[in-house]
């Protein structure tokens, strides 16, 4: 099967519908049908500067980089590229952080609608798992660079990697609690998993 790619406009209102970030069960959005952090994705690594740049782009009505989603066999979606931007947008709309000292819930109705009606350009990709993983590796050469372990996790995903990430790739993971004084690097960039 050759990967099929279709361009679709999705509003931030649609994207943030049923957004949920659950440390153990993952991150979902888009009516609960989008897996924002599939097994091959890294943890959220954007800092304040990057998050604010995303919100500034949306607020100004400038075009945001294209995102890539993949369809699953059950009709739901998973993010191939755009996880960091998606989480930044969802966190802002859910008032989890302020942009220019204003939380989303403090904006006027018109300001909220302008953001919620903003259209994101999303390529929906349909193909085999190996095609999707290859596409993930190909399109992730820009942006915040992936570390070698993050790329390995994209190529070698599965239940073992998912379990290992739970224990070694979160700031609240058991490995961090036990080894923080002895290990260098960042658990969310998967340095502990690589060790």
Predicted regions and their residues:
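C-terminal active-site-capping segments
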Residues: 14-27
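Basic- and aromatic-enriched surface patches that contact anionic nucleotides/nucleic acids
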Residues: 2-17, 40-195
